[in-house]
Structure formats: C-alpha cells, structure tokens
Curated annotation (Swiss-Prot):
Highest taxon of source: Bacteria
Residues annotated to bind Zn(2+): 90, 92, 106, 109
Bound cofactor: record note: Binds 1 zinc ion per subunit.
Protein name per its UniProtKB record: Replication initiation control protein YabA
One Pfam assignment: YabA
Subunit structure comment from the entry: Homotetramer. Interacts with both DnaA and DnaN, acting as a bridge between these two proteins.
Signal peptide boundaries: none
Organism annotation: Staphylococcus aureus (strain JH9)
Keyword annotations: Cytoplasm, DNA replication, DNA replication inhibitor, Metal-binding, Zinc
Recorded family membership: Belongs to the YabA family.
Listed GO biological process terms: DNA replication
Cofactor(s) of this protein: Zn(2+)
GO CC term, one of those recorded: nucleoid
Function: Involved in control of chromosome replication initiation. Inhibits the cooperative binding of DnaA to the oriC region, thus negatively regulating initiation of chromosome replication. Inhibits the ability of DnaA-ATP to form a helix on DNA; does not disassemble preformed DnaA-DNA helices. Decreases the residence time of DnaA on the chromosome at its binding sites (oriC, replication forks and promoter-binding sites). Tethers DnaA to the replication machinery via the DNA polymerase beta sliding clamp subunit (dnaN).
Length: 115
C-alpha cells in the first residue's frame, strides 16, 4: 500500500465515522422525543383517571387471561419531577440531581419519569 491508498482509506473511514455519529445523534434525539411523549401521555392518562374517578385499572376477563399485575399508582411527586425537568433541571439519581441541563436532554432523567 502506498501513501495515497492509506490516505484514501483514512478519509473514507473518517467519512463513515462522521456518518455514524450523525445517525447516532438522530436516533438519540428520536428516542428522547419518544420517551418524553410517553411520559407526557402517562401523566395525562393518570390525570384523566383522577378526574373521571376511575383509579382502578380496567381488565378484560377471558378464559385464558392471566392474573393482572399490580399497577403502580403514580406518585404526586412525579408531576413535580416532570415540572422540574421541563424547567431544565436534572432529576436523575446521583450527582447531577438539581443541576441545570443547559438545554440538553438526559436519558437517565427520562428513565426516572418513565418508571
């Protein structure tokens, strides 16, 4: 291999790495959007259940149905955490809790909201 071939391979490798980095960033942004939407829908669903007075989960009885799993009731503190996250603060466990996110999304914080 001469220098030109090595240089061309390095250039192609750099282009591939840049493309992978771009695609990874896009996937991360999409995952964050989906988790945020899921959390918002869960909170909205919980609030609607409270308004309707339907706190008990609905189950469908069938001959082959398994016993329903216990559904966690959402804690009112989760709403407060969602508000804090919306204002730009970390709510994830550990050293970052309470620190400003500087406009960046945090998958750990979103995991706390989705639990």
């Amino acid at each position: 291999m001469d220098r030109n071939e090595i240089f061309e391979k390095i250039m192609r490798l750099e282009m591939n790495v840049n493309q992978l980095s771009k695609e990874t960033s896009e996937l991360k942004a999409h995952a964050v959007e989906l988790v945020e939407e899921n959390v918002a829908l869960q909170l909205e669903n919980d609030n609607l259940k409270k308004v309707l007075g339907n706190d008990e989960p609905t189950t469908i009885d069938t001959a082959n149905s398994k016993p329903a799993k216990a559904v966690k009731k959402p804690l009112p503190s989760k709403d407060n955490l969602a508000i804090l996250y919306g204002e730009g603060f970390h709510i994830c466990k550990g050293e970052l809790f309470g620190k400003h996110r500087h406009g960046e999304d945090c998958l750990f914080c979103l995991e706390v909201l989705s639990d």
